[in-house]
Regions:
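Low-complexity, Ser/Thr/Pro/Gly-enriched N-terminal "stalk/linker" regions
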Residues: 1-76, 101-120
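C-terminal beta-rich recognition modules with glycine/proline-rich loops and embedded aromatic residues
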Residues: 13, 19, 211, 291, ...
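Hydrophobic core segments within long, regular secondary-structure runs in both alpha-
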Residues: 18, 25, 29, 37, ...
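Carbohydrate-binding/catalytic loop surfaces
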Residues: 50-70, 118-136, 186-198, 228-264, ...
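Active-site neighborhood of glycoside hydrolase catalytic domains
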Residues: 188-190, 195-223, 233-309, 313-320, ...
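Well-ordered alpha-helical scaffold segments within catalytic/enzyme domains
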Residues: 21, 81-94, 142-157, 192-203, ...
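Beta-strand-rich binding/interaction modules
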Residues: 479-499
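A conserved hydrophobic secondary-structure block that centers on an alpha-helix together
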Residues: 124-201
């Protein structure tokens, strides 16, 4: 943990202008945020009701009625506000800001005199903090805090920040080691990382100390949850909790003893993100080491090639090493967001490019697969193989949706996707003292202050269609000396770097190319990475992928879809000895780099109705078209497959 922690570049100082990402970023500003505002106000016909804003109106006395929705329904508006804040940080939008301010006014009026804020417990009158296992009070508080911090940093308005500070002050009087306080912790981690954010913006150490208390206390014996009424009397809000062991919420042992990622995937990576934050703030090398162990277990043994996590639908959880089924997995969009958050924090502490590789994998694949290109339909679950006729009839796959949905009763994923896209700049760059880091190759312009002075960078690329990346440097004054660190992706076997057309020898350290020199206005760094198509194979311990290949280009995973290749994709066999052909399809989804593959398929015209027989099926040679996994299901319902049989 040598040196200071890297910091992200202020979103106000980043302008993204990228041929690939613009369509998604523009969706957030022009479609997703207005649409989700209508959704949380229950104004979209045909979508599941949110009841979120309605609950706040009831809680503050504007309306009469019962609480509806989940115990954590308040987080719908919290995550929407956070996404709105990131959007406003880039560009002021009076209409969006007015909507956000109206929601904040409502939240402020729903807050209790002592600072408590939660519509479910306020409206129902149920006892506060009586069901930490599943009541989600602290989880909901965490998302409120994250939203308030983001809104303050984006707009300078402090009303929402004051609301959550009052709430956090109250929580500090309720929870802690002291006698008379509750010695418990959240059933769903989230407030821990939020309290660290609140500490960083307010410098109030009691918020950091409370976050540390929650993390350090988790898993102690006797387990706090076992003494709660819901467990003792089997009186659960969520009936399935009766089947879950303590590893479901990572409370089965102290965190510094946990070496495998267990339980609910979102809970896990939110918790690990907080652990990474606290490891830095307290310079706790032991806690950081535990983060590394857990991260390695996820990435090396429990993560899908698309950057998604959570193999089982029941419990939305991790299972065991190398258990990665393709058609029944859960792979929740929120879990992918959490993995990106955890990985980005680990990069900021260690400056190791392996963590950013996973951020990139998660963002380019599962995150984008979670949203349709109309910005109004979403996936909660992200399988790697779908046969609609089976998924819709077999209850084993009841969690798998064969088309994206308008909204969900548990709608954590749509606003989570929105807030991640809106804050993309946080993942693209980082800086420390006199070094600026380029992590993702997203066309953009940034301004930042280093110890040597002000610096402006203009990044141009058509990544990952092409591997060329150009950085134009504008220092505060000619002769200004500083370092540029550019990530060399692990999938690029080579990287050619030049400055003003002249090749440069650079230092490669932990996946980053470092170039230190005295810069002048107009200097251009050009890096060429290898993003050609490649076939990737899986560790044979993953039974589902034996004898199969996956096609990738740069960080992007590709798949076969019924719209291009017909039915029975699981029987198609790819000839990996034939290099894939680049096929840019202007008409597909606004222009998409596809791949032409050669192989063979079963001749189903010669297949009869006999269920079992001795004769082998007949194969015929054919060509196939693969598209980016993130683009699947934008042309109607149909089969999809990522892992293809290999000749």
């Amino acid at each position: 943990m040598d040196g200071g922690k890297l910091t992200t570049v202020d979103l106000k100082s980043i302008i993204i202008n990228d041929p690939f990402w613009n369509r998604y970023i523009d969706l957030v500003d022009h479609v997703i945020l207005p649409f989700q505002w209508e959704l949380i106000n229950d104004q979209v016909e045909g979508a599941e009701k949110s009841y979120c804003i309605r609950n706040f109106r009831i809680a503050c006395g504007d309306e009469k009625g019962d609480h509806k929705g989940m115990v954590f329904q308040d987080t719908d508006v919290a995550k929407w506000l956070e996404a709105a804040a990131y959007s406003l940080a880039k560009k002021r939008n009076p209409k969006l800001e007015a909507a956000a301010d109206s929601a904040i006014d409502l939240i402020a009026r729903a807050q209790c005199e002592d600072g408590y804020l939660n519509t479910y417990y306020t409206i129902t009158g149920e006892k506060r903090w009586s069901d930490l296992l599943e009541g989600h009070e602290l989880y909901t508080a965490g998302h409120m805090i994250e939203a308030a911090v983001a809104y303050y940093e984006a707009t300078g308005k402090n009303k929402f920040l004051h609301v959550v500070c009052k709430f956090a002050d109250y929580m500090c009087t309720v929870f802690g080691k002291e006698e008379g306080k509750i010695h418990g912790y959240p059933g769903h981690p989230e407030v821990e990382l939020a309290l660290v954010k609140l500490y960083r913006v307010t410098k109030m150490t009691k918020y950091l100390e409370l976050a540390d208390f929650f993390v350090q206390t988790r898993g102690e014996r006797p387990c706090y949850f076992l003494n709660e009424d819901c467990v003792k009397n089997q009186n659960f809000i969520f009936p399935e909790f009766k089947d879950f062991d303590l590893d479901y919420n990572q409370s089965h042992m102290p965190l510094k003893e946990q070496e495998t990622a267990e339980g609910h995937a979102v809970r896990a990576v939110y918790l690990y993100s907080a652990m990474a934050d606290l490891a830095y703030e307290y310079q706790d090398k032991e806690l950081l080491k535990q983060c590394e162990i857990l991260w390695n277990n996820i990435v090396e043994k429990r993560m899908y090639i698309t950057g998604s996590i959570g193999s089982a639908s029941y419990g939305e959880r991790f299972t065991t090493d190398y258990d990665l089924p393709n058609n029944s997995n859960y792979s929740e969009s929120c879990a992918t967001v959490g993995l990106a958050m955890f990985s980005n924090r680990m990069f900021q502490i260690t400056r190791d490019g392996k963590y950013t590789d996973i951020v990139e994998k998660a963002l380019y694949n599962t995150l984008l697969a979670g949203i349709a290109l109309d910005g109004k339909h979403f996936f909660y679950v992200n399988p790697l193989e779908v046969v609609p006729e089976i998924a819709e009839k077999n209850p084993t796959y009841r969690h798998v949706k064969t088309t994206r949905q308008l909204w969900f009763g548990v709608a954590c994923c749509p606003p989570n996707i929105a807030r991640t896209l809106a804050s993309l700049g946080n993942y693209v760059y980082a800086s420390e003292q006199n070094t600026v880091y380029v992590n993702l190759f997203v066309g953009s312009r940034i301004e930042t202050d280093l110890s040597s002075g002000h610096v402006e960078l203009l990044l141009s690329s058509d990544y990952p269609v092409k591997g060329d990346v150009t950085l134009e440097i504008t220092p505060e004054m000619d002769g200004q000396e500083f370092t540029v660190g550019i990530r060399k992706p692990s999938y690029s076997g080579k990287a050619e770097l030049s400055v003003n057309g002249i090749k440069e020898a650079v230092c490669l350290e932990k996946g980053y190319l470092y170039l230190t020199r005295k810069w002048k206005a107009g200097d251009k760094i050009t890096v060429v990475f290898d993003v050609s198509f490649r076939f990737v194979r899986c560790n044979p311990r993953v039974r589902d992928n034996i004898g199969k290949v996956c096609l990738m280009k740069g960080p992007m995973v590709y798949c076969l879809e019924e719209a291009d290749n017909g039915k029975y994709l699981a029987s198609d066999i790819m000839d990996s000895s034939v290099p894939p052909k680049e096929e840019f399809d202007e008409s597909l989804l606004g222009g998409t780099m596809c791949a032409g593959l050669e192989g063979m398929r079963i001749d189903y015209s010669r297949v009869g109705d006999t269920l079992y027989e001795e004769e082998r099926p007949s194969y015929i040679k054919d060509t196939f078209k693969a598209i980016p996994y993130c683009c699947w299901n934008n042309r109607g319902k149909g089969e999809m497959i990522v892992w293809m049989r290999e000749k």
